[in-house]
């Protein structure tokens, strides 16, 4: 299974250097947000993609498809995380069906 990354230029470069299989860079413009949405939908349909990483900022703009596979994880960009513990709990709950508690 492959890992795909959708993010801004800096995030994409970091994950490319870390060895992500497919990396796509987008700017924060209306045209690029449309391209991003199309690319995300394309990746969700592919059977060889197991994990999609997408920056939190872009998720706030385009939303996420309601799928159980591939796993879609939100990652912070260079400006830091917008979410936190609750978002991570929700990701785990959706991915494996277990609710994390303190």
Curated annotation (Swiss-Prot):
Keywords of the record: ATP synthesis, Cell membrane, Hydrogen ion transport, Ion transport, Membrane, Transport
GO biological process: proton motive force-driven plasma membrane ATP synthesis
Name of this chain's protein: A-type ATP synthase subunit F
Residue stretches in coiled coil: none
UniProt keyword Glycoprotein, yes or no: no
Description of how the protein assembles with itself and partners: Has multiple subunits with at least A(3), B(3), C, D, E, F, H, I and proteolipid K(x).
The gene coding this protein: atpF
Keyword Membrane belongs to the record: yes
InterPro entries to which the protein is assigned, alphabetical: ATPase_V1-cplx_f_g_su (IPR008218), ATPase_V1-cplx_fsu_bac/arc (IPR022944), ATPase_V1_fsu_sf (IPR036906)
Family: Belongs to the V-ATPase F subunit family.
Main location: membrane
GO molecular function (one): proton-transporting ATPase activity, rotational mechanism
Subcellular location field: Cell membrane
Protein function: Component of the A-type ATP synthase that produces ATP from ADP in the presence of a proton gradient across the membrane.
Membrane topology value: Peripheral membrane protein
Gene Ontology cellular component terms for the protein in this record: plasma membrane
